[in-house]
Amino acid sequence: MADFFTEKPVATNVAEFSVSEIANALKRVVEDKFGYVRIRGEISGYRGAHASGHAYFALKDDKARLEAVIWLSVMKKLSFPPEEGMEVIAVGKLTTYPGSSKYQIVIEALEPTGVGALMTLLENRKKKLAEEGLFDAANKKPLPYMPKIIGVVTSPTGAVIRDIIHRIFDRFPLHILVWPVRVQGETCGREVASAVEGFNALFLGGGIPKPDLIIVARGGGSLEDLWGFNDEAVVRAVYASAIPVISAVGHETDWTLIDYAADWRAPTPTGAAERAVPVKLDIEVHLASINSRFRVGLARYFDFHQQKLRALVRGLPTVDQLFALPRRGFDEISSRLQRALCVSYDKKCFYFHALSLRFSPRLLNTKKAQYAIQEYTGRLHRAFLRNVEKQRAQVEMACRLLKSTSYQNILERGFVLALGKDHKPIKRLMQLPETGQISLRFFDGEIDVSTHDRAVNRSLKNKRIKSQKDDQGLLF
């Protein structure tokens, strides 16, 4: 027994690994060999997202089962919620989990497959959005009759955009803005929603003009091809658009959720172009017809009223008829007035003749004398007034002369008048009393002053007078 435990191991060339080494080696082999793969399968064991936001489930078919995980960042980007039993195509990277010796796929994109699964998902989404009122007819906006600018959301390289441009230019040429998007694939829904929101974000007067109408168009295809136009983000963007939207996705039998949210659904992209703009020639013909009818109607209107006016004119009396009665009355009144004046004149003449017979020649002479006296009286009164005015003028002239020679004017120029006790002017120095009172009259008043030492003052004054005698005379 002891020999058994002490026996040396048999020599071999097989490499020896630890559990973790072999697990990591398998992990590298799987990841390097396969990398990214697309796997079709049925979702199994899905119970919704974990508390962390990640989702753990399995993909299976009738023979095998593969564990799968979707991280939170990818879950937020999915265009539909995964459901138990849904057939999908998962795109991701194969890897292993060394802790439990399991291999799994880390899903980075997930899309439904199979018509049944897609139809179920479509119906559920349609019901949900309809309950929110996104498809209500009351929310539909009227389309402009003649838009100036049309925004088109579609692929820039497909036949759809060429058909739309060709049809619009045939009917009514105008400005077209194309917002290029992918019309199929995983990013289709997000790009279409961003395009609709982008057109609404433009403002009037900017570098890029804001369209008056938006057309979202795509050619026909399968349910999977058109799935991007069933995206919830597309429906909400179209519903929130302030610009009217025409949906033209697929053929007439193809219905997507954008058709329910749009303001008008066209069976084809060509039909959308025809609905967007009227035919210019039809408008011109219609305007010409309206113009012609207007001219005819206007001519009829004038003819009718001209005939009516002529009838009214014929019913009106002429000028002679209008003035015949007043003229006749005027003539009668003129004749009566002339006769009345003649009669009155004759009466006055007869009356004055009768009065003249009543006056004697003496009375007539007295009347003539009275008239003469009245005339002479008037002439005398007028002569008296003229004489009074003449005398008044002479008095006023004398007053002005007297005022000009008044000594008050001299006092006003700065001179002083000396008055003695008798209030007579003192003209010479010798007239001053030796002692006593004299009055000095100024322009604005009078003051009494006393005199003394007349001899001294007189001699001084005499010298001054002699020196100035030749230059200035006496004041008075």
Swiss-Prot record:
Reaction(s) catalysed (UniProt annotation): Exonucleolytic cleavage in either 5'- to 3'- or 3'- to 5'-direction to yield nucleoside 5'-phosphates
Ordered alphabetically, the record's keywords are: Cytoplasm, Exonuclease, Hydrolase, Nuclease
EC number from the UniProt entry: 3.1.11.6
| Pfam families reported for this sequence | Exonuc_VII_L, tRNA_anti_2
**Any one GO molecular function term:** nucleic acid binding
Query: What are its GO cellular component terms?
Result: cytoplasm; exodeoxyribonuclease VII complex
Q: Which CDD domains match?
A: ExoVII_LU_OBF (cd04489)
Where in the cell does this protein reside?
Cytoplasm
Biological processes annotated in GO: DNA catabolic process
Q: What is its main location?
A: cytoplasm
Domain of life, source organism = Bacteria
EC supergroup of this enzyme: hydrolase
Q: How does it assemble?
A: Heterooligomer composed of large and small subunits.
Q: Which family does it belong to?
A: Belongs to the XseA family.
Question: Which purpose does this protein serve, as stated in its record?
Answer: Bidirectionally degrades single-stranded DNA into large acid-insoluble oligonucleotides, which are then degraded further into small acid-soluble oligonucleotides.
- PANTHER family with a match to the protein in the record: EXODEOXYRIBONUCLEASE 7 LARGE SUBUNIT
Q: Which HAMAP family match?
A: Exonuc_7_L (MF_00378)
* Name by which UniProt lists this protein: Exodeoxyribonuclease 7 large subunit
Native organism taxonomy: Bacteria, Pseudomonadati, Pseudomonadota, Alphaproteobacteria, Hyphomicrobiales
